[in-house]
Regions:
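Short glycine-/aliphatic-rich beta-strand segments at the starts of folded cytosolic domains
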Residues: 1-11
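C-terminal structural segments of small proteins and small subunits
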Residues: 6, 19, 47-72
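Short amphipathic alpha-helix segments
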Residues: 9-26
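A generic structural signal for short, solvent-exposed coil/turn residues
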Residues: 23-25, 36, 59
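A short linear hydrophobic-aromatic micro-motif
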Residues: 28-33
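Acidic/polar N-terminal loop/beta-strand segments that form early-domain functional surfaces
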Residues: 34, 45-47
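Surface-exposed aromatic
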Residues: 38-44
């Protein structure tokens, strides 16, 4: 399953912190950022399990950033 999130994260240091936390909490998840996109995309792939969508949103928000599912 793949989930795409819109964020307001602009700096690589912040993305590294968020990605580290995601990968520690959910080892089966692969997550990447695309900061060149206007929506500052967070792409999350769950190979063996569904993506914990709300938990990912909550994690990013507790770090002081906006995060929402990007709908087609």
């Amino acid at each position: 399953m793949i989930e795409i999130f819109k964020t307001d994260i602009k700096h690589k240091a912040a993305t590294k912190q968020v990605l580290t936390e995601i990968h520690q909490q959910w080892p089966g998840i692969v997550a990447t950022f695309d900061l060149e996109d206007n929506d500052k995309i967070l792409r999350v792939v769950g190979a063996w399990a569904p993506v914990p969508t709300q938990e990912i949103i909550d994690l990013v928000k507790t770090r002081g950033f906006m995060c929402e599912v990007l709908h087609d």
